[in-house]
């Protein structure tokens, strides 16, 4: 497919598409852009943004699965916790951006799309089928060129792709790969190496060894001229001029992705650190494009883990702040877009069973994600046939939920389980031990 020349109109259209994406109906959009003096004056007069300078530095942040409820739950949680339980809404780094909106996110065949098709829409402006990455939905043999590829080839921009999940996962892959199915993980990794993009950072390749007959994805990248860095110390030591770089996070959690923000150890690099390193490595006179995905918001919501979702949204806010800091140093040359590819889980903030209350401060008692609890404790319970009461002692430690028979029951407050809840938990636990 021939490269279409980037005009000012098409670039801004691509920017609008990049801000437009969510799983059931709409996703939030926020943008912070370079303005000319004329547009600033127009803004002041009539509230409209009429004229942009062409952005030299473009940041695109995608909260995978991050609908309005995910954003608001993080704002409410932070506001409540920071104000001793008072009903207070906190600002995030991107919630006060001057341009805000929402968009529908259906793909070519479904109102409930996945990350492959929605990320394709963001990256190329084309709709396709769920599961397909940057290929036409009818024959799956016509590739779509991505905005990252256009900027890299036609404008000489350096390009960075960052994700808290696997670097070959659907969303990051949609900026450099073209595959009939998102499950072609090894082939996606090969396309990463062939992209020539200057900076990649995230979790491990999902099928790093392919079918075992060829070089692993690390070797493929190294053979293509990439510095393949797998330690945090090695990443920290990188400086401008390091050349093409692929960083695989040293500390990996479930699914060989980066750890949830709430599970990260003290000093462990999180999304913000990789954004800052990306800025350091990509910054140049021609410009750069950086796509950053907070991918485990989606994973948390698939697991109905509200606390993990909240903490990953807050960490994404920190990462966006790093871009805002860069914007403040380059206000007339920088565009920041913050959006989602789709919403996940149909999150609601309060409902009938909670009497439309939220109990957000209860989440402060959760000390680890559901996924980490499962891998750290539940697998051992299954192997050892741990008694229910012993397992619930760990639940109390890491989530605060307390049995009525516990010595601390009188002081457990709203975290005291009812007999009905205990019966349901016991049944579910026994079923877990039975089926593994």
Could you tell me what each predicted segment is?
Residues 1-10, 14-26, 32:
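N-terminal secretory signal peptides
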Residues 26-56:
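C-terminal segment of N-terminal export signals and the immediately downstream linker at the start
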Residues 47-48, 62, 68, 72, ...:
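Alpha/propeptide regions of enzymes that mature by internal proteolysis
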Residues 53-70, 75, 139-154:
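Active-site-adjacent structural elements in enzyme catalytic domains
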Residues 55-57, 66-72, 76-120, 169-436:
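A post-motif C-terminal structural segment
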Residues 60-61, 161, 338:
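Structural beta-sheet core signal
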Residues 110, 114-138:
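A glycine- and small-residue-enriched flexible loop/hinge segment at structural boundaries
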Residues 127-190:
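Extracytoplasmic mature domains of secreted/periplasmic and thylakoid-lumen proteins
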